[in-house]
Swiss-Prot record:
Gene3D superfamilies: DnaJ domain (1.10.287.110), HscB, C-terminal domain (1.20.1280.20)
GO cellular component: iron-sulfur cluster transfer complex
The J domain, residue ranges: 2-74
Key words, A-Z: Chaperone
Pfam families assigned to the protein according to its UniProt record, in alphabetical order: HSCB_C (PF07743)
Entry's family note: Belongs to the HscB family.
The protein's role, per its UniProt record: Co-chaperone involved in the maturation of iron-sulfur cluster-containing proteins. Seems to help targeting proteins to be folded toward HscA.
Protein name as it appears in the record: Co-chaperone protein HscB homolog
Subunit field text: Interacts with HscA and stimulates its ATPase activity.
Keyword Oxidoreductase: no
GO function terms (MF aspect): ATPase activator activity; protein-folding chaperone binding
Amino acid sequence: MNYFELFNLPVAFDVNTSELADKYRELQRTVHPDKFAAASEQEKLLAVSRTAMVNDGFQTLKDPIRRAEHMLALKGVDIRHETQTVRDTAFLMQQMEWREALEEITHADDPHCLIADLYQSFGDFQKQVTAKLKTLLVSEDDNDLQAAADQVRKLKFMAKLHVELERAEDALLD
């Protein structure tokens, strides 16, 4: 299922989230199971199925990582359920540095400064990865698509690391 087609949006990494939300509400009005209360069981089941598809499409397109995974899947590169990691040595070294910095937060003289530095570092890195990803996603070349998949893997790692940083920050407030 091409969710971009479902929502009548161009296949692109950047999505107008207001337009997406408007189209989501519009689709929900047409497929919501309540509209089929007096319909046959088969029509009710179909309405439930369509509603689930619209909901999944909306969740996929509003999340940049899931959107990128969907774009790759449309081009035959399905990484949505994989466990493969990035084999980029420089990225692996950066991961280790970030993890060490996360562990230092509780012992740092100024943990809030360290947290701010990590947020800045994460944000800068995510911007670089996202810019590269946008370029690679428009390609039809298999090597570029595999490189795009690696960029998505990096973003997934960064999302997990961001959650860990938020937890560390919350722990300081407790």
